[in-house]
């Protein structure tokens, strides 16, 4: 959230720089590397900007899974369509009380896999890895903490904080599954970086 959504609503402010923000994340399931991210809003325009970044960050043919947000299929078809095997995974959540919803995510009661184009391997239609990374980012970046006053006040600062968090995750964070940093696994660097390395880059 940038500034305060409640203030924006109360004062009738029409300013795209105030209100909710959304962070798109593209993750490689094998190396756990965050390939691309985009801080904006959950709209078709920002979805297209994110998928364009993902297009620039990847090469060759690969399998892609997203949630059911309706802006993804057109953006992916335009930027990545000829080289992706694309499916969606839509999760259905149970009904929780308002109090439960404030402090924890609702319970998943069903999940539906849908092939959009290409020939994705059904066993690899999964959003669990990126959901785990989303949790990591939320835990590492105070600005994502819910129900606090730690939200960002300025877009520029928020984008910078997210970029630094992503860079630290890719280059400095040892991943338990692969036993190295994602950037090392992907062959981008030959050793884990320290925070000093990151700040000096």
Task: Tell me the role of every PLM-derived stretch.
Residues 1-201:
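Residue-level recognition of single "structural anchor" positions
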